[in-house]
């Protein structure tokens, strides 16, 4: 007589083998084709964003007439410093405080350091920097006057 346990084991093995073959065949038939890694592995890149330029630089040239509030220089940091009749914005933009003519000049700050300045003067022939002993020129009621000149009321 055949051992019943052996028969069951052999029968179970054959069933298992048949079911695996069926699953293998059914997987091939039912699943769609898979693309290779050349398509799926696109990856990521970190340095693709190229932003537009910020339009920095000198906006008005030497001896050019400007009105009050006009931007003279847009810059990052203080490559140029504000001189006479100019102001410095919070983003280091230099702008005109009065109407006049643009002048660029350099001054020694220390023995080894020289700074570039931009200023606005009322008369085209005026040069900057002005001597330290010379009084500053201011515009009062559209007339150019000296700072130490006496005004009669």
Swiss-Prot record:
A cellular component term, taken from the record's GO annotations: mitochondrial large ribosomal subunit
NCBIfam families (alphabetical): L27
Organism: Schizosaccharomyces pombe (strain 972 / ATCC 24843) (Fission yeast)
Pfam families xrefs: Ribosomal_L27
Subcellular location: Mitochondrion
BP GO terms, sorted: mitochondrial translation
Function of the molecule: Component of the mitochondrial ribosome (mitoribosome), a dedicated translation machinery responsible for the synthesis of mitochondrial genome-encoded proteins, including at least some of the essential transmembrane subunits of the mitochondrial respiratory chain. The mitoribosomes are attached to the mitochondrial inner membrane and translation products are cotranslationally integrated into the membrane.
Keyword Transit peptide: yes
Keyword tags: Mitochondrion, Ribonucleoprotein, Ribosomal protein, Transit peptide
Keyword 4Fe-4S (UniProt): no
Protein name (Swiss-Prot/TrEMBL): Large ribosomal subunit protein bL27m
InterPro entries, alphabetized: Ribosomal_bL27 (IPR001684), Ribosomal_bL27_CS (IPR018261)
Subunit text: Component of the mitochondrial large ribosomal subunit (mt-LSU). Mature yeast 74S mitochondrial ribosomes consist of a small (37S) and a large (54S) subunit. The 37S small subunit contains a 15S ribosomal RNA (15S mt-rRNA) and at least 32 different proteins. The 54S large subunit contains a 21S rRNA (21S mt-rRNA) and at least 45 different proteins.
Transit peptide: 1-37
Molecular function via GO: structural constituent of ribosome
Record-stated family: Belongs to the bacterial ribosomal protein bL27 family.
Region (Disordered): 34-57
């Amino acid at each position: 007589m055949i051992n019943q346990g052996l028969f069951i084991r052999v029968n179970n093995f054959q069933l298992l083998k048949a079911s695996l073959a069926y699953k293998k065949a059914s997987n091939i038939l039912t699943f769609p084709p898979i693309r290779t890694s050349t398509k799926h592995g696109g990856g990521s890149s970190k340095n693709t964003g190229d932003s537009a330029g910020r339009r920095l630089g000198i906006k008005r040239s030497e001896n050019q007439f400007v009105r009050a509030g006009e931007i003279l220089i847009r810059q990052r940091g203080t490559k140029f410093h504000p001189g006479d009749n100019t102001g410095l914005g919070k983003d280091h933009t230099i702008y005109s405080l009065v109407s006049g003519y643009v002048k660029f000049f350099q001054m020694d700050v220390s023995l080894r350091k020289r700074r570039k300045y931009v200023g606005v003067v009322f008369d085209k022939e005026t040069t900057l920097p002005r001597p330290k002993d010379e009084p500053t020129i201011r515009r009062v009621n559209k007339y150019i006057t000296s700072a130490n000149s006496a005004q009669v009321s």
